[in-house]
Amino acid sequence: MNTCIQLLILCLVTVINSENSTDNSTENTIENEIENATETELSEAIENETENVTETELPETVETEIQTEAQNQPQIPKQKYCKSEGQYCSRTYFHRCCGNLVCQLHGFFNGTCVQCLAERKFCIWSSECCSRRCRLFRCRKNPYVQVIPY
């Protein structure tokens, strides 16, 4: 009886081992097929993509994108970050007046852009004053210009 049981156990172990080995071999085969399939499919896909693209397509695409972006951009003034006449200014780099305009201060770093500064306004340079005369940080009358009343 013992020998029969031993034979049965031996048969079962053999059958189980053979099933496991076939499972492993089928798993390996499936993995190899997947790897081979993906490599060939990938290379075919790359070949198809490169066949469809011509040399002239890329520069035209880039050129049209640049043109559309340029059309969407606002016109940039000659000086960046400058204010036009009548706008807020502060006599700083970030809020300065454009061109020959001058910032007429009304308070501490608070002013508006004007053509030139009137008499008794704060100035640094003579060119900022309408009279072209800046003394002691104030625009002064020009003694050489006389206003003749009618």
UniProtKB/Swiss-Prot annotation:
The alphabetized UniProt keywords are:
Disulfide bond, Glycoprotein, Knottin, Secreted, Signal
Renumbered to this chain, the signal peptide range is 1-18
Q: Which Pfam families match?
A: UPF0506
Name where it's found. Answer: Secreted
Q: Which residues are glycosylated?
A: 20, 24, 36, 48, 52, 110
- Cystine pairs annotated here are 116-130, 123-134, 129-139
**Top-rank taxon, per record:** Eukaryota
Can you list the GO cellular component terms from the UniProt entry?
A: extracellular region
The primary location reported for this protein is: secreted
Q: Kindly give the InterPro entries that the UniProt entry links to this protein.
A: UPF0506 (IPR021712)
Q: Which family does it belong to?
A: Belongs to the UPF0506 family.
Give the domain note.
The presence of a 'disulfide through disulfide knot' structurally defines this protein as a knottin.
* This protein's name: UPF0506 protein SJCHGC02380
